[in-house]
């Protein structure tokens, strides 16, 4: 879905990558990054075939969609009541809006996805719907996937994402935009697992309206290079955000988690816990930014980071 809509996005993304070049350590967000690994991702050709992976059956009652960057994930699928594809005008209006709201539409990983993704899964959620499972697999080359979910007022969704990859010459670029209407509830799980050498860059942009609840739990392990970036904005405050993350690194892997939460209104809540386990010569990074401007009175934000070093040669920042 969205090939026609994404063509100008791809052109703008490619132009942006040429203009920006690769990030440098002079930029605070990339100061600790192994830029050689980033350069290796930039050199990868786009994956030319859909990867095949052996995965267990979907949970009972859940809807599983496969995102491989090559095919329309909705082809031949009957969606349950409450889940509908966005129309073309709706997609043109909504695509990229949450990225803009979160201030990350022109970041390098997002521009890489803009330049590379040829399909977008765009769904509207009404009421309470069955659990949704999105499975993405990557093998040789760069696999780029993009998802847009609009939760209407009082909608409820349980979303599980599984990102898999094999081989040092494979990388996964993923961008997810989420808009939660008033009193909407989203429980979001992300499991990203690889064979030890592949690369991952995942951006999760979330826009919350008042009295909405967003709970995000992520587990990242096995990637030679991994960068996960959840970014949340509570547009008028009065919303609840819960972020729980675990990064497990070994060998010479580098796993980074960069989060940003902004409160644009009063009475917002944040509960965040990030855990890292680092062994061998691995390196884990956590950077959590919280923005509470003057209008965000009575904000209650809690953030904790816990680390476990399994080797005296491992590093945590």
Model-derived regions: residue spans:
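N-terminal leader/transition segments
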Residues: 1-145, 152-154, 163, 309, ...
């Amino acid at each position: 879905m969205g090939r026609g809509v994404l063509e100008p996005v791809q052109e703008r993304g490619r132009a942006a990558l040429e203009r920006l070049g690769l990030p440098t350590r002079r930029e605070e967000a990339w100061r600790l990054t192994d830029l050689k690994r980033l350069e290796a991702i930039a050199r990868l050709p786009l994956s030319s075939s859909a990867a095949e992976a052996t995965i267990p059956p979907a949970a009972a009652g859940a809807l599983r969609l496969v995102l491989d960057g090559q095919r329309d994930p909705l082809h031949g699928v009957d969606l349950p009541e409450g889940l509908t594809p966005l129309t073309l005008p709706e997609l043109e209006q909504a695509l990229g809006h949450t990225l803009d709201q979160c201030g990350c539409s022109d970041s390098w990983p997002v521009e890489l996805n803009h330049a590379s993704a040829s399909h977008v899964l765009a769904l509207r959620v009404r009421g309470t719907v069955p659990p949704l499972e999105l499975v993405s697999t990557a093998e040789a080359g760069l696999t780029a996937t993009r998802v847009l979910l609009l939760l209407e007022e009082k909608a409820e969704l349980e979303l599980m994402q599984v990102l898999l990859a094999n081989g040092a010459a494979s990388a996964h670029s993923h961008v997810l935009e989420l808009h939660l209407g008033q009193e909407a509830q989203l429980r979001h799980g992300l499991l990203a697992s690889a064979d030890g050498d592949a690369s991952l860059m995942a951006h999760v942009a979330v826009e919350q309206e008042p009295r909405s609840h967003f709970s995000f739990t992520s587990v990242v392990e096995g990637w030679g290079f991994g960068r996960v970036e959840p970014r949340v904005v509570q547009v008028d405050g009065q919303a609840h955000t819960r972020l729980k993350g675990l990064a497990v690194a070994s060998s010479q892997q580098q796993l980074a988690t960069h989060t940003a939460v902004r409160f644009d209104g009063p009475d917002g809540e944040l509960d965040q816990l990030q855990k890292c386990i680092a062994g061998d010569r691995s390196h884990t990074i956590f950077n959590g930014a919280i923005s509470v401007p003057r209008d965000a009175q009575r904000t209650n934000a809690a953030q904790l980071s816990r680390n476990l070093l399994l080797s005296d040669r491992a590093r945590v920042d």
